[in-house]
Amino acid sequence: MPNFMVEKDEAGLALIDFLQRKIPAAPASYLKQLVKKGKVCGRSGVLTADSPLLIGEQIHLPESGRLQEFLAARPMESRPLQVLYESREILVVDKPAAPAIHSSRGHEQDNLTARVEALLQQRGSKFKVAPVHRLDLETSGPVLFGKGRKACGELGPLFMRREVEKYYLALVAGKTAGRGRLESPVTAKGKRKAACTDFRALERNEQASLLELELHTGRQHQIRQQLAEQGHPLFGDNRYRGPCPPGLPRMFLHCSRLVFVDPFSGAPLAIDAPLPEELALFLSQVGFGNSCYSERIE
């Protein structure tokens, strides 16, 4: 059974923040589910998110194949940042799952923006960079940064005007239709908002379907909500009750391609991000190969 001792500088931390320190490869949503289900214990028994942590206390976690994979994984900050495209005004990097894009609670030091800033500092660049769109914490794929205020001012409106084509790969439970359009509204900030997603099945069997999806709107958790409502939640998605088998260390959702016109040069750009190794390896467990990822929705 994995266990950790609370050190002097960790006393008083929120339980989730403590666990993120100890298991940096684990998504916050996964750790929150462990706590919510009563799987994390201390000297007083089952711990809640509000339980105070005391110096010297032993924190016990359950035996779990998925947890062991997180514990064995390299910390995210030790993995080199992959640059997918760069010009004078634009930098596109391949975001792994887990790090937040911006500084936020639990991600003050290690977040994607901080990594990009560190990369440019190493080069001696003095550009002030900022991301111009977002990906959910557990989603991997290309993130577009503008170099300087003027570049950000030109790039941000591309997403607001929906001039960027966004493609995703997702593995979902069950056998879906071969292709279709999802138009059910999604809940965002307490309100139901219109959402539109096209999908095509790249591989299917009775257990699972590998889908390529194109987003026409950019609602938070759009793909996850719409597919779960159809009875096909994503593999690894605790929040929407997707299957979470031991061999899958994260949610199976990856942004695979961004297509847009460079507002500075006028050149058309198609930026592809390869399927992360941990997702590609898992596909064989559900009987799928890897020969179809380059196909696009027509």
Task: Go through each PLM region and give its residues.
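RNA pseudouridine synthases
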Residues: 1-193, 278-286, 293
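Pseudouridine synthases involved in rRNA/tRNA modification
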Residues: 1-33, 79-81, 203-208, 216, ...
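Short Pro/Gly-enriched beta-strand edge/turn motifs at strand-loop
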Residues: 64-66, 194, 238-244
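Short beta-strand micro-motifs in enzyme catalytic cores
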Residues: 91, 168, 209-211, 254-256
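Short beta-strand segments enriched for Tyr within beta-sheet-rich domains
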Residues: 155, 219-227
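Long C-terminal interaction/binding lobes of large macromolecular proteins
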Residues: 199
